[in-house]
Amino acid sequence: MLIEPQSRYQDEYIFLFTEKPTALQLLSRVLITRWILCLLWFMTLWAEADKLEGYAPEVAALLQEYQDTSDANGSTIPSIFAYRPDSSGRTLIDFESGLIVASSETISGLKQRIVEVLLTQIDPSVIDAHTAYDLGLINQKTKKPFFFNQIKDHDGESIESVWRAERFANFLIYNELRHAGDFSIVLSMVATHKQLAGAKYVRYVLESTRSHQINPSLVMAIMETESAFNPMARSRSNALGLMQIKADTAGRDYFTRIKGYAHTPSSAYLYQPAQNIEIGSGYLSILARRYLVGINDPKKLEDAVIASYNGGAGNLWRSLNSSGNRKQAIARINKMTTREFYWFLTNRHIRSETRDYVRKVRTRISKYEALLTNNGNGALPVAINPIEIIAHPPTGLFFQSRSIA
């Protein structure tokens, strides 16, 4: 049975989408479709903005940054770790700022997310015990949780038991709960969280830097700058782990030039702190003793290594010589004072990221020199043999007697 149109507008609508369209009608369809898509896009933005409303500025910035840069595998910002065991919840951990944002569709799910981050409980369906130990999520000797001492409960106590973790989770849900779509809470680590995080890796740093004869303060400073001590760090370019190693460049170079055979390390290998630090330290040695050989002053060599670790040796040469001539670039470096070369790197290097990187690492080297040589007076809370520090004088980065082919 034919149903008559109820109005002129309905008649025109039926005609528009059932008859063979004219060019004008096709244009109308395109415009209508685009208008609908724009409306949906604005509604999505409004919904996301509404979710961020009410958060402190630094928390909203973290959530927005993750939203803008994440992919199917999680965060591509090295200092941010996103843990999402299922579709109902998510935990974001910012190793740089010390902020933790846990969210879930349900209150019970949120409590589970909070307890997980406080204790890094091992669920075999998510991560097995062996992997957790390898990644440093639980200290193999003390069995302490990964964030032990970095997070304190409402009584100012460190958390290592299920009872205390659940008690603190209940406190947070009762006092800090936020509901905008999902249920969520924001948790802050202690002010010294990065110092405490870095202390976990000092033993590995001392072992690798002794082997490769480089300054441990340099490795600590690079580690903080690259990942803020996030062992699961991953960048958009797939640089991995604490020192942000790219498997097919720095990783392969390490095995070829130091181990003596061609090999590209796996992601699982690079996510293990001891191995990541060993490769990073070895690659710093390769930069100094092969790619940057010829720079005479140890301090200028150290600054050149820092710049090249971030931007590559080729960009260093191009910054100093328009044709990228290595020999001429090195000759120019050797004519500069240490102060002039540092100024050049932080003001004239062709990559702005590298200019900022050199500033950050150089500042942090000074911090770690003080922390490593003054343990016990506000320094890194680990036991360090003074003989190991003496073997790495802070003013002499590399021993010049050894070269890498």
Residue ranges and their predicted role:
Residues 200-203, 213, 217, 237-240, ...:
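Short, well-structured alpha-helical interface segments that form or flank functional binding sites
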Residues 236-263, 275-286, 335-336, 361:
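Substrate-binding/active-site groove segments that recognize
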Residues 227-236, 252, 311-323:
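Secretory-pathway/luminal and periplasmic proteins that interact with or process carbohydrate-rich
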Residues 193-196, 267-277:
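Active-site metal-coordination segments of metallo-dependent hydrolases
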Residues 221, 242-244, 307-308:
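Structural recognition of the beta-strand scaffold that forms the well-ordered cores
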Residues 276-325:
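Catalytic and binding regions of secreted/periplasmic enzymes and modules that target cell-wall glycans
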Residues 225, 246-248, 309:
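Active-site-proximal beta-strand/loop segments in catalytic clefts of secreted hydrolases
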Residues 2-224, 232, 289-298, 322-405:
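Cell-wall glycan-active module
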